[in-house]
């Protein structure tokens, strides 16, 4: 994206610290950063699934992993976060659910 004649660049970082009670399972959340594609995403797994023996973190991790794959297949400057999430969800086989957000900085 151009701003005053200059191209914008997304700089991001992350740190993931699961709740101490959920460290053994790795927590219920997942995220990604695609530097070249200027996209980031986060999924917050629904912890209530633990009541029926499902690790919601696996769903969130798989959803974000598939999101990265979909983004890498998209044309670089036309990433559509809603489409990415829809495609990633259709590939996700783990049980569970999550809230999710994907953003991408593009020239369009």
Regions found by a protein language model. Give the residues of each.
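PP2C/PPM-type serine/threonine phosphatase catalytic domain
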Residues: 1-108
């Amino acid at each position: 994206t151009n701003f005053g004649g200059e191209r914008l660049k997304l700089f991001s970082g992350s740190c993931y610290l699961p709740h101490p009670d959920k460290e053994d399972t790795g927590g219920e959340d997942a995220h990604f950063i695609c530097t070249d594609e200027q996209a980031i995403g986060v999924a917050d797994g629904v912890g209530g699934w633990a009541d029926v023996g499902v690790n919601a973190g696996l769903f969130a991790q798989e959803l974000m992993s598939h999101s990265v794959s979909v983004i890498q297949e998209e044309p670089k400057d036309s990433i559509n976060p809603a489409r990415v999430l829809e495609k990633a969800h259709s590939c996700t086989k783990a049980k569970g659910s999550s809230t999710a957000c994907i953003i991408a900085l593009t020239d369009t």
